[in-house]
Amino acid sequence: GLLQTIKEKLKEFAGGVVTGVQS
């Protein structure tokens, strides 16, 4: 559903932020 999609996008966004910080 929509909520699941939002959760997935938030996970991707958080992962991108973590990757950016570590770089």
UniProtKB/Swiss-Prot annotation:
Keyword set includes Coiled coil: no
CC annotations in GO: extracellular region
GO BP, one annotated term: defense response
Gene Ontology MF annotations: oxidoreductase activity, acting on paired donors, with incorporation or reduction of molecular oxygen, reduced pteridine as one donor, and incorporation of one atom of oxygen
InterPro entries reported in the protein's UniProt record: Aromatic-AA_hydroxylase_C
Record key words, sorted: Amphibian defense peptide, Secreted
Principal localisation: secreted
Family: Belongs to the frog skin active peptide (FSAP) family. Aurein subfamily.
Function, in words: Has no antimicrobial or anticancer activity.
Name assigned to this protein: Aurein-4.2
Organism, as annotated: Ranoidea raniformis
